[in-house]
């Protein structure tokens, strides 16, 4: 019987996962209880004047990319639709991969597109924290187009690459 020679890895990776979970919970609790305003915007703590609208209202840092997309479209309804789509795409994304291979390491062009997308989201986040003025408006519009084009181009490149491999 070959079971005698096998090493049971179940306790090891289970213990590793439990330790990792405990460390992450500890870090989260430490952040929330010790310094809850660390990632907040200092402008949120300025007492409001109800007679004056603030010059720049901005959301939390994790929605700044969507805020930049909202501001980059001049039409109000179009901006709101783009804002909702920019977040809804992220929820649909796990069901979006229809490629033959389940890793991006087999698609070199998609690797380049991934890094372009990462830079695009970082720049959109930065632009979301800037005031609404030139050149940020034009740059936000260009990056918004790149953001949505990624979701159109990425599956086409994957299918093209799958056809090349056949």
UniProtKB/Swiss-Prot annotation:
PROSITE patterns: CYTB_CTER (PS51003). Its cofactor is heme. It comes from the Eukaryota. GO terms for molecular function: metal ion binding; ubiquinol-cytochrome-c reductase activity. PANTHER family: CYTOCHROME B. Component of the ubiquinol-cytochrome c reductase complex (complex III or cytochrome b-c1 complex) that is part of the mitochondrial respiratory chain. The b-c1 complex mediates electron transfer from ubiquinol to cytochrome c. Contributes to the generation of a proton gradient across the mitochondrial membrane that is then used for ATP synthesis. This is Cytochrome b. It comes from Drosophila subobscura (Fruit fly).
């Amino acid at each position: 019987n070959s079971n005698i020679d096998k090493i049971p890895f179940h306790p090891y990776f289970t213990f590793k996962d439990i330790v990792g979970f405990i460390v992450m919970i500890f870090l989260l609790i430490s952040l929330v209880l010790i310094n809850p305003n660390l990632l907040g915007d200092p402008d949120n703590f300025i007492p409001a004047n109800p007679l004056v609208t603030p010059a720049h209202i901005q959301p939390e840092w994790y929605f700044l990319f969507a805020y930049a997309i909202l501001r980059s479209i001049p039409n109000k309804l179009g901006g709101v639709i783009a804002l909702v789509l920019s977040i809804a795409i992220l929820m649909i994304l796990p069901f979006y991969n229809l490629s033959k291979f389940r890793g991006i390491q087999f698609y070199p062009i998609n690797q380049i597109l991934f890094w372009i997308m990462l830079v695009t989201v970082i720049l959109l986040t930065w632009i979301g924290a800037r005031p609404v003025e030139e050149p940020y408006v034009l740059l936000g519009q260009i990056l918004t187009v790149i953001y949505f084009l990624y979701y159109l181009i990425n599956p086409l490149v994957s299918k093209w690459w799958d056809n090349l491999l056949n």
